[in-house]
């Protein structure tokens, strides 16, 4: 990109950030934050609490785990289906916790709702790890579920329980689960010390299991988890990620030593430009770099170097960018729904900018340096795109703004609710709602869809699942972003 222009990278970057198709009005980030948290109530599985705010949802999957003799009710459906996938659920919980840890003070009255959303996830993860050296990683058969279009309250598809254990390794899921529990223990450290200790103790046990019985669940449970949440990147990053969060939560030297000792073996320098439910490398580098920037951990210096390189790779105009930008200014990266990359990478930009600000540092990026303010502006531009500053002139968050997706790929949202249609709607009976051109009858407020790609185009149609399906891991990093921007803009 830089080689094709006479402009310096800094000028090109400024143009991308400041020039848009037209002048847009400001955004109500507080309203967007409220709605982004509310979305998680629409994804709840199990028996709903009295304070449930999305009233069109009802109890579902109340016998989950019974076939294995355990209680696995609760937790979250990952997206527009009715399967509970443990890997993305754990990552979602980790990212909600990180959002609260770093940006909770800016969330105002929505902080407690964010904490409730985290606890809905951790309560389930505690159930999933109740047996030593076992993690229940999935409830539901994805193939039978995806063959039906029915609301969760009616579902009669297989609720098969899948687990990892000593003979069926799954270090990536166990490592991420340990990270989620450890991160959440920080959230509850002062709010509920007893619960916080339970979370940290369980995280410690699950991490020990993850590293003792190393292996990928994509191998041991291939038929169940692939191609849905196959771990394409290997389990090594989740071991470092879990250790990093346990070190942050416990301050124990053993986890610091694990990170330093294993950073080469566990490929800490590999794929450092990636971050999401499958790949934690960029997140590890940003998280660990905070200690380096505080002057407390020179032994983690290589992680800061990786973090700097990652940050530079996101900036438009750099010689070897790891992402593209659409004409409308959207960050675009291949692999699944694009908004998962937009929110997770923007979260790291904002988080790192804050770490740099407190240390009075900048990021060297070849012929120019990136200031914390610049990183924040890049992140804000992405959030504003989601909220409506884009060529389609629409918000990609359901219920925010005057124009937003109406026909999202989501079973519960698109099929009439049990409130309006008490009679059961069976597996294939829901197909007419999937193919309908009518808007979804139930607003899944706060849901952020997969969104457009490099063309900035968006077909508001359920069959385009990569574009119109929301996921929990799109929204989770957004909590921190919206919390920060609601307090500072």
From Swiss-Prot:
It is found in: Secreted. Glycans are attached at residue 453. Its main location: secreted. One of its GO terms (biological process) is cell wall organization. Residues 1-25 form the signal peptide. Belongs to the glycosyl hydrolase 9 (cellulase E) family. This is Endoglucanase 4. It comes from Arabidopsis thaliana.
